Amino acid sequence: MKILLNKSLCFLLSGIFLTFIFAVSAQAQTEKEIVKIRAEVAAINKGVSKYTKTTKDVEDVSLEGTEATFYHSAKNLKKITAKMYGETYNQTGEFYYQNGELIFAFIKRNQYDTQIGMDAPPKVVSTEERRFYFANGELIRMLVGKKELKTGEKYSELKDEIISVSGKLKDS
């Protein structure tokens, strides 16, 4: 019985150790991907003056309108900046692409105290920054302010929203 208990404890500790090693390894891989993404975003921003720039209004992105500027190098989309307006907010977005795939998005959202069009002009009551890092078509990190979101309803909602907005902008 004692030998069986020792073996069970040994297997349990081995499992915990391996789980820890895999988690640390996955975190290290994510950090490497983040470093690569940041380097690519910096390179895109450094070369932005060389890209072909096109600005247009885009439908079906936000309720009160969206103006987007597209930056292309040859036929490759590198970056989109967008000003998006809703009834109770405005937000700016920067979307970065590598080989046609979204790699990073930055959103700065200003929330109003009331709807636009009311008697008193709306005032910004809060500002929130969101950062989304993608590798191989998968979201690998989401930051809302300085807090990393990993799961949950808000995570799923924001992930779906950023993918949808990026797709609508790209397809316009």
Language-model regions, residue ranges each:
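Mid-chain, structured segments of secreted extracytoplasmic proteins
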Residues: 72-114
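Short, surface-exposed coil-to-beta transition loops
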Residues: 63-67, 88-93, 124-129
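C-terminal partner/receptor-binding element of secreted or periplasmic proteins
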Residues: 135-172
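An exposed acidic His-Trp-rich patch
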Residues: 103-143
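N-terminal secretory signal peptides
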Residues: 28-87
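Bacterial N-terminal signal peptides
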Residues: 10-23
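Aromatic-rich beta-strand edge motifs centered on tyrosine
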Residues: 69-72, 95-97, 130-136
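N-terminal secretory signal peptides that target proteins for export/translocation
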Residues: 1-7
